[in-house]
Amino acid sequence: MGGVHKTIERQRSSPMTSLLIAIHVLAAVLLMGPVMITVSAYQSQMMKAKDGDAKALGAATTLHRLTSQYGPISAIVLVVGIAIFLTNLSAFGSQGRFHISILLSAVAWILLIAMIIPRQKKTLAALESGSKAVDFAKEKKQLSMFGGIFNLLWIITALLMFL
């Protein structure tokens, strides 16, 4: 057993902590997985849609909808993680990896809300209206960069949980 499990074994955890950990893990799997995929897949569909592919426009629309709906809800992973941390400070408070995980999760979530979702929304609006005002090549690079950073932050966070 690794990470969180070792920490909890050292310290008797309350049923509330166990419940919060279960919610945290389920939320991470059910919410973060889809968001990580959608922020990675949107750009290629956007570029195909720019060239007139109607199916790609539908796919880009669906990917953006998933990102913009699951993304904000995914804050539950961070909120529950903080709740776990605060309900058992004696077990988690002295371990820097949990501090780092909370920080990385917050940065990833802010990146999603402030940079990724607005760019997807802007490019999708341009695709739907046929506007040529958007530099799609530049937006693809930006979305790929921010999506890659977002995914890397979550992967590092997940690894820290199992150290």
Set out the residue ranges of the language-model regions.
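Residue-identity detector for glycine
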Residues: 2-3
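Polytopic transmembrane helical bundles with strong interfacial aromatic enrichment
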Residues: 8-163
